[in-house]
């Protein structure tokens, strides 16, 4: 059961530092429902039942966007898998748009999410944009309204430039591989 409430993350670095998931999802019935949905989507995911994982994942993503950083990694994989298997183009586009929105939402809550993440595991704006560019290029052709190689290239360039500017991390190989492919195709 999904209640009509939406959680909001406040991006204050110290707010969630050192907290556990129970402290970030509230108390009472909402937290019980959210915890149940976390367990349900992870169990379905592990069984590679991505369609079964979708609804409980969506409930967690909507009600508790700062519950766990893994909500975003699992969500990207769940959405990618249901997108690929979906035959109805209207639904396929909706899943694709939801996938792109997942990255926008992660950017919006990045500081709050990073506040309870180990320093070496914290996402940067460049990391998130590069991954969004990868998924746009990989899944967007024939699905995304207004898809273009130039847009994909620009998205990659922004993410990669930010990662390189930051200097703390390397650009993941799969991102570079797709970036080179898009660069060659344009």
Regions found by a protein language model. Give the residues of each.
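Bacterial N-terminal signal peptides
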Residues: 1-9
């Amino acid at each position: 059961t999904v209640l009509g409430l939406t959680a909001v993350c406040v991006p204050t670095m110290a707010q969630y530092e050192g907290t556990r998931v129970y402290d970030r999802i509230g108390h009472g019935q909402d937290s019980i429902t959210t915890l149940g949905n976390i367990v349900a989507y992870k169990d379905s995911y592990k069984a590679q039942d991505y369609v079964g994982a979708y609804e409980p994942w969506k409930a967690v993503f909507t009600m508790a966007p700062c519950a766990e950083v893994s909500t975003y990694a699992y969500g990207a994989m769940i959405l990618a898998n249901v997108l690929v298997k979906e035959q109805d183009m209207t639904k396929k586009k909706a899943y694709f748009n939801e996938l792109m929105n997942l990255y926008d939402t992660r950017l919006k809550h990045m500081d709050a999410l990073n506040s309870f993440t180990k320093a070496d595991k914290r996402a940067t704006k460049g990391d998130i944009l590069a991954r969004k560019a990868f998924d746009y290029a990989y899944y967007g052709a024939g699905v995304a309204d207004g898809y273009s190689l130039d847009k994909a290239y620009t998205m990659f360039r922004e993410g990669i430039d930010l990662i390189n500017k930051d200097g703390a991390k390397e650009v993941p190989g799969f991102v570079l591989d797709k970036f080179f492919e898009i660069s060659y195709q344009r």
